[in-house]
Curated annotation (Swiss-Prot):
The gene is GPC1. It is found in: Membrane. This is Glycerophosphocholine acyltransferase 1. Residues 132, 184-187, 243-263, 340-346 are lumenal. It comes from the Eukaryota. Glycerophosphocholine acyltransferase (GPCAT) that utilizes acyl-CoA to acylate glycero-3-phosphocholine (GPC), forming lysophosphatidylcholine (LPC). Shows broad acyl specificities with a preference for 16:0-CoA, polyunsaturated acyl-CoA, and the hydroxylated ricinoleoyl-CoA. Also catalyzes the acylation of glycero-3-phosphoethanolamine (GPE) with acyl-CoA. In addition to acyl-CoA, GPCAT efficiently utilizes LPC and lysophosphatidylethanolamine (LPE) as acyl donors in the acylation of GPC. Residues 413-432 are annotated as: Disordered. Its EC number is 2.3.1.-. It comes from Saccharomyces cerevisiae (strain ATCC 204508 / S288c). One of its GO terms (molecular function) is glycero-3-phosphocholine acyltransferase activity.
């Protein structure tokens, strides 16, 4: 009879309820883009347990006392059924991974050609909805979110960047969805969503140079998660008719001025919730993978690239992380100081969103010019080097040909000179 290890059961039970274990559960299909395919240990263990489970089902119990423990048998059967489900799910995911990998990585040019008109259409259609049908804009935002986010998850997971999905901008998007569909009556949630979207998300476009590159799914999705949520909050507060807003979003009916103290309190509370979850599931539980370089986070990227020479990075652990966390918090408070203006003046809020959109568009234009311009320069330089190398290879051969030709010319002249001398001698003898 197949004997179960209680430690294995406990480990599997704990993993089944962990959010990060769901990500690690998919590890057998790790990225083919940045590394070779690795047949992960999760799949090997699951397949081994499935084989044991198949043998267990074919064998009858050898001991009579096993039949007197239905609880143990039910627990074993449930656990093995879970392993069976995991293996079948992994097989389905692997079967789906091959065409998706071809679409998003190997033959991405076709997808980018199709995504270019899709992005253009959405830019104009979003503007049309905001002006003509504002009551449907939050619905369209939700649809786009659940279209783009699975793509973002898949592409980030394949490139081992899926820990970036736990960043604050995604948390704010989830808060917006919670307000729209579950807690539309929550004044504090709307106040926090408005402050986060018009504060942290909008200024992130300027600070971190989000680029509206309309053929790129990755860059367009980044602009979507930073620009569209403040547009949704703008439409809900400034664009909806009062009667509809009272019925659909009662939490958005606030005075023309924000209570700064309450706003700081609520946003700090939501920020604390996010930081606690982030540091527990990512910083602590996955610290080994982060330190080994298997996974990348925003903190690791900043401290190893843009701010690697910053004095705070060179401090002993955990001071760099503490300084980074506090800096994020004060940055969030600083960026929401102007939210009182965006609440009070509709035109000012519209102009601010327009500036953010134009800033992202300018970054996108800069990307196109710099990226393709630099690639063209590199191609020209490469061709120039090839021509120079070819000329250097041909130079010795040409010199040899020229030297041979000069020798032949000298021989030819000498022969002609001798012939002329003989002819002159014969003529002189005849004359004599």
């Amino acid at each position: 009879m197949y004997k179960l290890d209680n430690n294995d059961i406990d480990d599997e039970t704990n993993n089944s309820v962990s959010l990060t274990s769901l990500l690690e559960f998919l590890d057998p299909i790790a990225s083919k883009v940045v590394s070779k395919y690795y047949h992960g240990s999760h799949l090997s263990k699951a397949e081994q347990k499935l084989r044991n489970f198949e043998g267990f089902r074919r064998r009858k119990p050898h001991h009579e006392h096993d039949s007197h423990h239905p609880h143990h048998l039910n627990r074993s059967r449930s656990f093995l059924q879970l392993e069976d489900f995991k293996v079948r799910a992994l097989q389905r995911i692997r079967n789906l991974d091959k065409p998706l990998d071809s679409i998003f990585f190997k033959n991405s040019s076709r997808l980018e050609k199709a995504f270019y008109p899709f992005t253009l259409f959405n830019i104009f259609f979003i503007g049309f909805l905001m002006g003509r049908f504002p009551e449907w804009f939050h619905v369209y935002y939700t649809i786009l979110f659940f279209v783009l986010m699975p793509i973002r998850f898949y592409t980030y997971y394949k490139t081992k960047n899926h820990y970036f999905l736990a960043d604050f901008c995604y948390f704010v998007n989830m808060l917006c969805l919670l307000f729209i569909w579950i807690f539309p009556y929550s004044y504090s949630l709307f106040q926090s969503c408005f402050a986060f979207t018009f504060g942290t998300l909008c200024f992130a476009v300027i600070t971190w140079r989000n680029s509206l590159v309309i053929h790129s799914i990755d860059k367009t999705t980044s602009c979507f998660i930073h620009i569209i949520p403040p547009c949704v909050m703008y439409v809900i507060y400034h664009g909806l008719p009062l009667e509809y807003k009272i019925e659909r979003f009662p939490g958005a009916i606030i005075q023309s001025e924000l209570d700064i103290k309450k706003n700081i309190l609520w946003t700090s509370l939501y920020y604390l919730v996010w930081q606690s979850l982030y540091h527990y599931f990512i910083t602590l539980k996955k610290s080994s993978k982060i330190k080994s370089g298997e996974r990348m986070t925003s903190f690791e990227y900043l401290t190893t690239h843009q701010f690697k020479n910053f004095w705070a990075v060179k401090l002993r652990s955990p001071w760099p992380m503490i300084i980074y966390t506090l800096s994020q918090y004060f940055y969030q408070l600083f960026t929401m100081l102007l939210c009182g203006i965006w609440i009070r003046y509709k035109l000012a809020a519209a102009l601010f969103l327009t500036i953010v959109f134009l800033w992202a568009s300018h970054n996108g234009a800069t990307y196109y010019i710099d990226h393709y311009g630099k690639n063209f320069e590199k191609e020209v330089d490469r061709l120039r080097l090839e021509v120079e190398n070819l000329q250097q290879k041909l130079q010795p051969d040409s010199d040899a040909v020229i030297s041979d030709a000069s020798v032949n010319d000298k021989d030819y002249l000498n022969v002609n000179r001798d012939e002329d001398f003989d002819d002159s001698s014969s003529v002189s003898s005849k004359s004599d």
